[in-house]
A protein has these predicted regions:
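Flexible, glycine-rich terminal cap/loop adjacent to redox cofactors
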Residues: 6-13, 17-34, 39, 46, ...
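FAD-site-proximal beta/loop scaffold in flavoenzymes
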Residues: 149-165, 248-325
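Glycine-rich flavin
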Residues: 2-3, 19-26, 31-164, 197-201, ...
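Gly/Ala-rich phosphate-binding loop of Rossmann-like dinucleotide-binding domains
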Residues: 18, 22, 181-186
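A Rossmann-like FAD-binding core segment of flavoenzymes
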Residues: 109, 113-121, 187-286
Length: 419
């Protein structure tokens, strides 16, 4: 079979690229070896947010008493929740498949391998195309093998958790690890967070991070900074986690969330001119073209900004550029709003003061913090902190960093003010 475009990977970026290319009249096929929707739908934002909403409901119950409500102790049917979560993901899988079918995009089930720059093999069949887009996404980074990885779960595994543990050790200091730490802590799990660095969320504003740590209710999350999991042993009833700082932790479940890596293995890229970066992500130019003129890449596989809206925008831009006769609008990924689903949430867009200084911009900060009226009846700490980074020269806003309830929604609106 010959196509104008073959997309490898039916995640958010790949599906958008395929759909837009088809709208422009291209003959398109898409290859997928798993479920439609990619990381976001199956093992990312969607199930993560469902976990988060579940945990927030439990957290809210604690605050109802402050308003005079008398509520019997609730019980969680974890198996029912997981069943409903899986049903929701299946619904979204079908929506993605429907988008492809309605746009007359051929679906090829299996794993693609390049034979050369114009041809791939899927199973026993070969397919040709004038252009290829690789959108195979990423996968969890696997911890060091000496840590007895059979006892360690990844951020993909967490979504098939059969029962809620009483104790959990999470290794990692990025947003994935921190989100899960707060999710499970708010579900009543005793969480120990292990991170090799001095500060969690190191790419975020340090004052925001400090505020988050101070907002953590006592006893819910214990932080073990400047340490790593060195070894894991199993006793009759416990997992024994040995840390590099010589401390030992007993737990029921271990989650490794030490980052994600690009999915570039077994694609047959050695049969093309595609080059990889040191971290195995695909090297592209600003128009997402690889070193092979026929092959492009978008989304997490290029390890630029690993967010679903970014992958969608990249796929849309690229399909317009390749198959639309009209001049495409240049993209700008300078100020991308980002959220972290903690308690309270973090929202950020633009530069921190440290970033501004590195860019040799003379800037200053405006900050405020307070407790919202909703929380004044409860015994929670201050739950809201806002920070603006201002250009001293022209008073424009360079960055906005907030921590509060609904910060993930607020930052979308506030982002339009950042230049």
């Amino acid at each position: 079979m010959k196509y104008d475009l073959i997309v490898i990977g039916a995640g958010s970026g790949g599906v958008r690229a395929a759909r837009i290319a088809s709208v422009h009249g291209a003959k398109v096929a898409i290859v997928e070896n798993n479920r439609f929707g990619g990381t976001c739908v199956n093992v990312g934002c969607v199930p993560k947010k469902l976990y988060y909403y579940l945990s927030q409901l439990n957290k809210d119950i604690e605050n109802y008493k402050s308003y005079g409500w008398s509520i019997p102790k609730p019980s969680l049917n974890w198996k029912l929740f997981i069943k409903k979560k899986d049903q929701e993901i299946s619904r979204l899988n079908k929506i993605y498949e429907g988008i492809l079918s309605r746009n007359k995009i051929d679906i090829i089930n299996g794993t693609a391998q390049f034979l050369n720059s114009q041809k791939i093999k899927v199973g026993k069949k070969t397919y040709q195309a004038k252009k290829f887009i690789i959108s195979t996404g990423g996968k969890p980074r696997i911890p060091n093998i000496s840590k007895n990885t059979k006892l360690i779960n990844t951020s993909d595994d967490i979504f098939t958790l059969k029962k809620l543990p009483k104790r959990m050790v999470i290794e990692g200091g990025g947003y994935i690890a921190i989100e899960f730490a707060f999710i499970f802590a708010n579900l009543g799990v005793k969480v120990d967070l292990v991170y090799r660095g001095k500060q969690i969320l190191k790419s975020f504003d340090s004052e925001i991070v400090d505020f988050l740590i101070q907002s953590t209710p006592k006893g819910k999350i214990k932080y073990h900074l400047e340490s790593q999991i060195e070894k894991v042993d199993k006793s009759k009833n416990d997992l024994i986690i040995n840390l590099t700082n010589k401390k030992k932790i007993s737990s029921d479940y271990i989650l490794s969330a030490i980052g994600r890596v690009a999915n570039t293995e077994n694609l047959g890229l050695e049969n093309t001119n595609v080059q990889l970066n040191e971290n195995k992500s695909i090297k592209v130019n600003r128009h997402f073209q690889t070193n092979d003129s026929n092959i492009y890449a978008v989304g997490d596989v290029i390890d630029y900004v690993n967010l679903t809206p970014v992958a969608i925008r990249q796929g849309h831009f690229l399909a317009d550029k390749l198959f639309n006769n009209k001049k495409t609008i240049e993209y700008d990924f300078a100020n991308i709003p980002t959220a972290v689903f903690t308690s309270p949430q973090i929202g950020t867009v633009g530069l921190t003061l440290e970033m501004a200084k590195k860019n040799k911009i003379d800037a200053y900060e405006l900050t405020t913090n307070f407790k919202s009226m909703k929380k004044t009846f409860s015994k929670t700490n201050k739950d809201t902190f806002y920070k603006l980074v201002i250009d001293k020269k022209d008073k424009t806003i360079l960055g906005i960093h907030i921590i509060s309830d609904d910060a993930a929604e607020l930052i979308q609106i506030l982002a339009v003010n950042v230049v």
